[in-house]
């Protein structure tokens, strides 16, 4: 009688240990699966934002942004570069430089310094009025067409139709300017 009770309790303990081992493997698999899926959720989580001074909401995640976001950032960058006066040109250009990719900084800095020198020397005030924006989010290209009004000293404003192209990169939740230049002779 003692032998069969001992065998029976050994079998029960073996079944319990086997069940617990199986449960540990199942839980380990579940934790690994949750870690993988949560990582994707964290990095692909989208946030809808509607800023106070912009009339359309946009969607951003850590790795992607939609066309409305690129449109808003482009309007901000255009304002920093083109809506300037001798008093504001340095601070606007310095803030704009904080968004430029490190590889393009030296070249872009020279262009902005030349523009600032001309603006200060000729007492130029300018304002850009956007008429058309085309956003190509796949390659990060934004084409902007508009009217640039410039006042040189106290003279009447000169008006020119200009087209600018920006190359923007969005990574890690931050926008960088790859290029920002005027497009000429494009048909």
UniProtKB/Swiss-Prot annotation:
Task: Tell me the domain of life.
Answer: Bacteria
- State the UniProt keywords alphabetically: Conjugation, Plasmid
State one Pfam family annotation.
TraE
Task: Provide the function of this protein.
Answer: Involved in F pilus assembly.
Q: What family is reported?
A: Belongs to the TraE family.
Q: What is this protein called?
A: Protein TraE
Species for this entry: Salmonella typhi
């Amino acid at each position: 009688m003692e032998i069969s009770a001992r065998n029976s309790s050994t079998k029960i303990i073996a079944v319990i240990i086997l069940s617990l081992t199986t449960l540990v493997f199942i839980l380990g698999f579940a934790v690994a699966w949750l870690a993988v899926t949560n990582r994707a959720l964290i990095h692909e989580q989208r946030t809808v934002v509607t800023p106070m001074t912009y009339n359309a909401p946009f969607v951003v995640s850590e790795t992607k942004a939609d066309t409305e976001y690129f449109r808003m950032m482009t309007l901000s960058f255009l304002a920093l570069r083109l809506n300037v006066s001798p008093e504001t040109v340095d601070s606007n250009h310095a803030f704009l430089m904080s968004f430029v990719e490190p590889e393009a900084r030296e070249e872009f800095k020279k262009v902005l310094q030349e523009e600032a020198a001309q603006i200060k020397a000729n007492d130029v005030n300018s304002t850009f009025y956007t008429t058309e924006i085309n956003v190509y989010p796949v390659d990060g290209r934004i084409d902007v067409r508009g009217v640039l009004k410039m006042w040189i000293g106290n003279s009447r404003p000169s008006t020119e139709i200009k087209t600018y192209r920006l190359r923007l990169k969005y990574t890690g939740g931050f926008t960088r300017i790859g290029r920002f230049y005027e497009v000429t002779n494009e048909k």
